[in-house]
């Protein structure tokens, strides 16, 4: 399972490298969609079936629609590929080599180091019981996100509204 997670992590980082060095909008959108699928697979690997499915359905469904329209508007007759420019190909290969080197370096360690320390983890305790119970952590975590992060939901909604308003104004023209 650790090797699968390392493979998914390398795929995710390589997707980001491919997106940042996109030679054509078509390939950038494709790599971003593939990176989203790999991110959903990482969430599923950690046991988050509900959140992985929601991200896959909502995020990737909307992304495919948006990138379908944007690539139709910015279509090129001969799109530039990753191998057409030497600089782009070298940067992708250097990024791949650095990622493989990092994975091999981290694989040599026996244990993992805690990077983040959660000080107030007690306030996130949703259900604490003595006996066995049928309760999933994933939907409860989504409920806690909307409860403790309600300001983030409001800011995200407002940002989406402003983005849609800007797109409508641009599409309307003069």
UniProtKB/Swiss-Prot annotation:
Major place of residence: mitochondrion
The keyword Nuclease is annotated on this UniProt entry: no
One of the Pfam families matching this protein, by short name: Oxidored_q3
Chain segments annotated as transmembrane: 1-21, 24-44, 47-67, 86-106, 111-131, 151-171
GO molecular function: NADH dehydrogenase (ubiquinone) activity
InterPro entries: ComplexI_Subunit6, NADH_UbQ/plastoQ_OxRdtase_su6
Keywords tagged on the record: Electron transport, Membrane, Mitochondrion, Mitochondrion inner membrane, NAD, Respiratory chain, Translocase, Transmembrane, Transmembrane helix, Transport, Ubiquinone
Any one GO CC term of the record: respiratory chain complex I
Biological processes annotated in GO: mitochondrial electron transport, NADH to ubiquinone; mitochondrial respiratory chain complex I assembly
Catalytic class of the enzyme: translocase
Signal peptide: none
Enzyme Commission no: 7.1.1.2
Membrane topology value: Multi-pass membrane protein
Protein's cellular compartments: Mitochondrion inner membrane
Catalyzed reactions: a ubiquinone + NADH + 5 H(+)(in) = a ubiquinol + NAD(+) + 4 H(+)(out)
Function: Core subunit of the mitochondrial membrane respiratory chain NADH dehydrogenase (Complex I) which catalyzes electron transfer from NADH through the respiratory chain, using ubiquinone as an electron acceptor. Essential for the catalytic activity and assembly of complex I.
Family annotation (PANTHER family): NADH UBIQUINONE OXIDOREDUCTASE SUBUNIT ND6, NADH-UBIQUINONE OXIDOREDUCTASE CHAIN 6
Family: Belongs to the complex I subunit 6 family.
Assembly: Core subunit of respiratory chain NADH dehydrogenase (Complex I) which is composed of 45 different subunits.
Protein name as catalogued: NADH-ubiquinone oxidoreductase chain 6
Species of the source: Pan troglodytes
Gene: MT-ND6
């Amino acid at each position: 399972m650790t090797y699968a997670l390392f493979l998914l992590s390398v795929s995710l980082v390589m997707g980001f490298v491919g997106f940042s060095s996109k030679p054509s909008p078509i390939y950038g959108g494709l790599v971003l969609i593939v990176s989203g699928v790999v991110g959903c697979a990482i969430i599923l690997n950690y046991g988050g079936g509900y959140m992985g499915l929601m991200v896959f359905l909502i995020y990737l469904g909307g992304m495919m629609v948006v990138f379908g329209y944007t690539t139709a508007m910015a279509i090129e007759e001969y799109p530039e590929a990753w191998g057409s420019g030497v600089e782009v190909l070298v940067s992708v290969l250097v990024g791949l080599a650095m990622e493989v080197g990092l994975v091999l370096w981290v694989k040599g360690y026996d244990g993992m180091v805690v990077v983040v320390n959660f000080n107030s983890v007690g306030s996130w305790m949703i259900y604490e019981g003595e006996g066995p119970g049928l309760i999933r952590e994933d939907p409860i975590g989504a409920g806690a996100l909307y409860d403790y992060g309600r300001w983030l939901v409001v800011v995200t909604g407002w940002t989406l509204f402003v983005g849609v308003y800007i797109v409508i104004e641009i599409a309307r023209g003069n």
